[in-house]
């Protein structure tokens, strides 16, 4: 009988790898809800499409490697990779952009290194970097917060039937880069210093903070990594 080696952690407790992955997916739901509220249904469409593409890509590469497909798909790592990448993409992303990013993340950044636990880099972020370098225009087209298109418009953006130019707007990072060196203009610009939650970005950040607190409360993560990351951003 052939033995199937599973990825770590090799424990006898109830929290297996799939359970941990599902908890992280649950933690993204507040962020997904707020992104949908502020930017429309494009993020939901992206997530669903990315998950489907990730599962198909994972199944094909597992089949090619002679690995049991169902056994490895149930660890939810491909689903989590797809969700994280889709949440990082603009809600105006066309279908092919998401497909390229997810395919590269699963096939190259994850499976070519041997699968879960063997890849040196986060597959979702590898896919994101590939898209940012290869398609910088498409990756920086965001809808203005609070001006969410309808479900039909979001679908038309996804399929490429509706041009994104008339709906997209500058992000805070775009504005900061444009006005860098001109502190007076930067300080008075509404997109950076608007009324609390008036521009939507604060609510997005708070929603993902809520997800992080959920993971800490469930002991899925500890406070050290997020605090260290934020300190690295804040300290010179």
What are these regions (language model features)?
Residues 77-151:
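A generic, well-ordered mixed alpha/beta core segment in the N-terminal half of proteins
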Residues 27-34, 58, 78-86, 102-109, ...:
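Hydrophobic, membrane-inserted alpha-helices
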Residues 118-209:
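Long hydrophobic alpha-helical segments that form multi-pass transmembrane helix bundles
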Residues 11-21, 62-74, 91-93, 192-202, ...:
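Short, amphipathic, aromatic/basic-enriched membrane-interface segments that mark the entry/exit
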Residues 6-9, 56-68, 106-117, 210-221:
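C-terminal ends of transmembrane helices
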Residues 21, 25, 44-48, 76-80, ...:
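Hydrophobic alpha-helical transmembrane segments
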Residues 40-53, 92-101, 194-206:
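Structural signature of hydrophobic alpha-helical transmembrane segments
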Residues 1-63:
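N-terminal signal-anchor module of multipass membrane proteins
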